[in-house]
Amino acid sequence: MQEGQNRKTSSLSILAIAGVEPYQEKPGEEYMNEAQLSHFKRILEAWRNQLRDEVDRTVTHMQDEAANFPDPVDRAAQEEEFSLELRNRDRERKLIKKIEKTLKKVEDEDFGYCESCGVEIGIRRLEARPTADLCIDCKTLAEIREKQMAG
């Protein structure tokens, strides 16, 4: 696997992918105004495009690297590498769907509010995780419930 293809995406790299600086709120500025929606639309579109490029590179890499190794160990190693790449791409495919769902919310001007309680999620949280659909309090409660159900 090529270096850089398997990196974790932090909030700073998401902003860097989009080529934008963290949003600077102005005093008294209305939450999720046109400028903020545009800011997040740029971030989400750039992130989605970067993930799509990763998928395309994986397909090309797998086609270029596919070889019928006579040695079973070499063949097994290649199959394991391809399997790992496909699992990563499957996760990215699911993330692309979530990004597209979030872009629809931006278009509908329904972005940035908690789906559970309706409060503002907040600019900084959304820059860290643009697909967040719960405020930090509701997300914390959901995680506590999830742990209780699992344990």
Swiss-Prot record:
Annotated residues for binding of Zn(2+): 114, 117, 135, 138
GO cellular component terms, A-Z: cytoplasm
GO biological process, one term: regulation of DNA-templated transcription
PROSITE patterns in alphabetical order: ZF_DKSA_1 (PS01102), ZF_DKSA_2 (PS51128)
UniProtKB keywords: Coiled coil, Cytoplasm, Metal-binding, Zinc, Zinc-finger
MF annotations from Gene Ontology: zinc ion binding
Compartments, record wording: Cytoplasm
Family matches, as Pfam families: DksA_N, zf-dskA_traR
Chain ranges of zinc fingers (dksA C4-type): 114-138
Keyword Oxidoreductase (UniProt): no
Coiled coil: 34-54
NCBIfam families: dksA (TIGR02420), PRK10778.1 (NF008045)
Family named by the database record: Belongs to the DksA family.
Protein's job: Transcription factor that acts by binding directly to the RNA polymerase (RNAP). Required for negative regulation of rRNA expression and positive regulation of several amino acid biosynthesis promoters. Also required for regulation of fis expression.
Quaternary structure note: Interacts directly with the RNA polymerase.
Protein name, as recorded: RNA polymerase-binding transcription factor DksA
Protein species of origin: Salmonella typhimurium (strain LT2 / SGSC1412 / ATCC 700720)
Source species taxonomy: Bacteria, Pseudomonadati, Pseudomonadota, Gammaproteobacteria, Enterobacterales
